[in-house]
């Protein structure tokens, strides 16, 4: 174990954040497959894919743990709560985009990065459409299960 833990570049005064877990090939492969880091995706498709995941998994807690979970409209209330949270998240993305990029007219050399106002707006739009669409898909899937229709 003494040979495994040693200072970075044999200098005890220089630190770094690489650990055996964070610098492993498996972790690097998992992170490179996330839509935020995947090569070749447009900002719209990044937002769409991230929104699809978020809208789908946000539906469950609102349906099963919401205040109207035992009523006849529990599923609809969960869906509307999910859409409400998606709107709030999209407003948060909008506020971040205005604060970070403002009204600047800089042109990026790479159209697929999220460091411009235009790319951030595309990402935000894709997120909203994907999240609302997947929440609607989850609503349709859950409404077709008889145990969710009648309690």
Swiss-Prot record:
Transmembrane residue ranges: 48-68, 73-93, 125-145
Membrane topology per record: Multi-pass membrane protein
A GO BP annotation: photosynthesis
Subcellular location: Plastid, Chloroplast thylakoid membrane
GO cellular component: chloroplast thylakoid membrane; photosystem I reaction center
Keywords: Chloroplast, Membrane, Photosynthesis, Photosystem I, Plastid, Thylakoid, Transmembrane, Transmembrane helix
Primary location recorded for the protein, binned into one broad class: plastid
The protein's name: Photosystem I reaction center subunit XI
Native source organism of the sequence: Phaeodactylum tricornutum (strain CCAP 1055/1)
């Amino acid at each position: 174990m003494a040979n495994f833990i040693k200072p970075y570049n044999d200098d005890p005064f220089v630190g770094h954040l690489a650990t055996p877990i964070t610098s492993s090939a498996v972790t690097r492969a998992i992170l490179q497959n996330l839509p935020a880091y995947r090569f070749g995706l447009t900002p719209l498709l990044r937002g769409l894919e991230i929104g699809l995941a978020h809208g789908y998994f946000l539906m469950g807690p609102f349906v099963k743990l919401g205040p109207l979970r035992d009523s006849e409209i529990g599923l609809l209330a969960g869906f509307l709560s999910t859409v409400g949270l998606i709107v709030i998240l999209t407003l948060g993305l909008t506020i971040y985009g205005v604060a970070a990029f403002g009204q600047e007219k800089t042109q990026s050399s790479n159209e697929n990065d999220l460091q411009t106002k235009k790319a951030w707006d595309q990402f935000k739009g894709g997120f909203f459409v994907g999240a609302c669409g997947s929440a609607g898909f989850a609503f349709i899937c859950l409404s077709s299960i008889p145990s969710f229709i009648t309690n």
